[in-house]
Design a protein with these regions (language model features):
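Alpha-helical transmembrane segments and their cytosolic interface
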Residues: 5, 137-177
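Interfacial aromatic-anchored transmembrane helix boundaries in multi-pass membrane proteins
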Residues: 24-33, 64-93
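Membrane-helix interface "capping/anchor" motifs
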Residues: 47-58, 95-101
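Short helix-perturbing small/polar motifs within transmembrane alpha-helices
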Residues: 81-116, 120
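Membrane-interface helix termini and inter-helical loops of multi-pass transporters
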Residues: 123-136
Length: 177
């Protein structure tokens, strides 16, 4: 099915609205903030699947700017801007690597670097309101990386469900592309 400009524009508007709803809810619903941010990130993948990489990037940028305008607590949107919002884009690019072992290695290094930066460089800014156990940083990074790989796996399952259910295409692999 050929995607018209009207279809792409409409889909972008719907994905942007849903993304903002999840970001906004994540900013004030206690206990499930990260779940809501993770759900908000799925719409970037939908845009990439339906319109290409440019559509996913545009959605991320629009949601980040609109979120900063709409969400009352500006720090509440930080997890979306710093990780969840662009993860679909990163996943798409990493999964273009032909070797599965290399893909996993790059993802682990990406998550570890991001967690290291967050825990060592910007702990108060990014995690100020989140209680983190007083474990050595290396254990927190290792545990966080395992959790992010689980997030990546679930993200892949949801993408595959979307493709089978809404695009009605076969799946040959667990790739976003």
């Amino acid at each position: 099915m050929k995607r018209t400009k009207t279809f792409k524009l409409t889909l972008g508007g719907i994905c942007l609205a849903l993304t903002i709803i999840f970001i906004y809810a994540g900013s004030f619903v206690p206990g499930i903030e990260l779940t809501l941010f993770a759900l908000s990130s799925l719409f970037t993948a939908v845009m990439i699947l339906e319109t290409g990489l440019g559509g996913g990037i545009l959605l991320y940028l629009a949601a980040s700017v609109l979120g900063l305008i709409i969400v009352p607590g500006k720090l509440a949107i930080t997890p979306y801007i710093c990780l969840f919002g662009y993860y679909g884009i990163v996943k798409y690019l990493i999964e273009k690597i032909p070797n599965a072992i290399a893909q996993i290695t790059v993802k682990v290094l990406f998550f570890a670097a991001l967690l290291c930066l967050g825990l060592l460089g910007f702990r108060e800014l990014l995690l100020g309101s989140i209680d983190i156990p007083d474990y050595p940083v290396i254990i927190l990074i290792a545990g966080g990386t395992v959790m992010m790989m689980l997030y990546d796996y679930i993200y892949t399952l949801v993408i595959n469900f979307y493709i089978r259910r809404f695009q009605k295409k076969g799946i040959d692999s667990m790739k976003l592309s």
